[in-house]
Structures are given as C-alpha cells and as structure tokens.
Amino acid sequence: MSNKIINLGSIEIANDKPFVLFGGMNVLESRDLAMSIAETYAEVTQKLGIPYVFKASFDKANRSSVNSYRGPGMEEGLKIFEEIKKTFNLPLITDVHETYQCAPVAEVVDIIQLPAFLARQTDLVVAMAKTGAIINVKKPQFLAPHEMRHIITKFNEAGNDEIILCERGSCFGYNNLVVDMLGMDEMKQSGYPVIFDATHALQRPGGRADSAGGRRAQATELARSGMALGLAGLFIEAHPDPDNAKCDGPCALPLHQLENYLKQMKAIDDLVKSFDPIDTSK
C-alpha cells in the first residue's frame, strides 16, 4: 500500500507526512468573528509550524430544529471566505449540501466537504467530483469503515481522485457516538489521507432535545488518541465563547486554549511518525 499525497499549494496531505490542521469555526456567525478566529488560527499555526486550512460552514442545512441558526447563506458566506483568503493567505475548506452549490463554491475554496449525512447521495458526489476540487468525505455515522470504498469509487468514476477521508464517530445506541480507532487504521489501508474530526466525534446527537449536546471536557483525550494513529490531519473547531456559539458549542474547543492544545497534538504526531513501522501480521 502506498500513501497518496494530495498537494494543496505548498501543503502535502498524506498519512506519513506532518499532520495538517483543518480548523476554524462551525458556522459563519458574522464577518468580524470569522476574521478574528481565522487570525488566531493563522498566528498559532504559523508559530508552531503546522500546515493549516481554515474551515467554516456558510449553511448548516442539517440542524436538529427548523428554528436553529443555519448561517449567512452561500452568497454572503463566499464573500467572507474570499476576504479571509486574501487577508491571511489561507487555503479554505467548506461543505456543500446541494448540487448547485458545488461549482460556485469551488471557485473560492480549495477543499469541498461532503457532509456525513449526505455521503451516499450520488448526484451530489458527481457534482462535487466534476469541480476538480480536493474532496473531504465525512464518514457517515452509520457506515462501517470498509464501506467508505464505495464512496471513493463513486468519486473515482466521476473523474476525481483527490480524496481525503474524515472520521467523525459512529452511532452507539441513541444520542451517542463512539470512535473506532481501528476503523481509522482500516481507512488508512486505502492509501488515501485520513483525518480525524475530534470536534464532532464529541457530539451527543439530539442530546439537548432540539440540538446536539457534546463532551467538550474530553476534547484533549480523544484528539490525543487519534493523533497516536499517525494521521494526515486533525479537524478541530474552536470558539471564543463556546457556551454561546450558534452551533455545536458543546463540542467546540475554547479558542484561548488552541495553542497549548496544538502543541500537544504536534508532539504526539512528531513522535509517532518518527517510529519505524512494525508489521505484526507476520
């Protein structure tokens, strides 16, 4: 098995390369907050020497409640993304939910994300593939790790091989997610880069009746475990005031803790990737 390398400008995304941080905020709440969070991430990652991609959503189309905040929408969201890219010289990742969004989004962002709940929607997969953009596939909570090969095949047959696989937890009974560490290793056997969404893996879906709950206090433990696998990247959302965030605050890392948090993750990644592989199958 060879590790596929995805090139994003000067950034190399691969399971055997230094990890890439995919981070930012869950949903665009305002232009000013997005700029502030992007600036913090940019400064911290530059200081620590961590390759970085800014993440935010312009529309959270799968909220638990019809009354929940969804975001500014595509048109306004893309304007904010353009300003962030220009101001901080950052690559961008965001998610799409409809086929018509793919082409205009791909003109602005570098990586398009396929949401976990939509990962089997063939029309959306094909539309995303045809943009030629790098694709981040969130593993659905209801699929086994080995079933990701079917989604990979759809993208390949639609002409796109620039694929990242993202673990974000699996359903474990009602209102709970667990992370299968061996499942992430199984996805790595595909050769495609695997990243770990340690933020959303902390969710308790529907845990607050009309919104998702979370276990923010365990954000460090879960991410440390994932980084010990030797992954291509880590996906982390942060917020300056998680308790008042408009989406997934219970899972968000407090922004002021970002630097110390990433220092630990980088130390683990550096250590694990300094080891020679051991083939215990023989």
UniProtKB/Swiss-Prot annotation:
EC number of this enzyme: 2.5.1.55
Compartments (UniProt record): Cytoplasm
InterPro entries: Aldolase_TIM, DAHP1/KDSA, KDO8P_synthase
Pathway as given in its UniProt record: Carbohydrate biosynthesis; 3-deoxy-D-manno-octulosonate biosynthesis; 3-deoxy-D-manno-octulosonate from D-ribulose 5-phosphate: step 2/3; Bacterial outer membrane biogenesis; lipopolysaccharide biosynthesis
Gene Ontology CC entries for this record: cytoplasm
Reactions catalysed according to its record: D-arabinose 5-phosphate + phosphoenolpyruvate + H2O = 3-deoxy-alpha-D-manno-2-octulosonate-8-phosphate + phosphate
Family annotation (Gene3D superfamilies): Aldolase class I (3.20.20.70)
GO terms for biological process, alphabetical: keto-3-deoxy-D-manno-octulosonic acid biosynthetic process
A GO term for molecular function: 3-deoxy-8-phosphooctulonate synthase activity
Keyword set, alphabetical order: Cytoplasm, Lipopolysaccharide biosynthesis, Transferase
Keyword Protein biosynthesis annotated: no
Transmembrane domains' residue ranges: none
Family under the similarity heading: Belongs to the KdsA family.
Name this polypeptide is given: 2-dehydro-3-deoxyphosphooctonate aldolase
Organism of this sequence: Shewanella sp. (strain ANA-3)
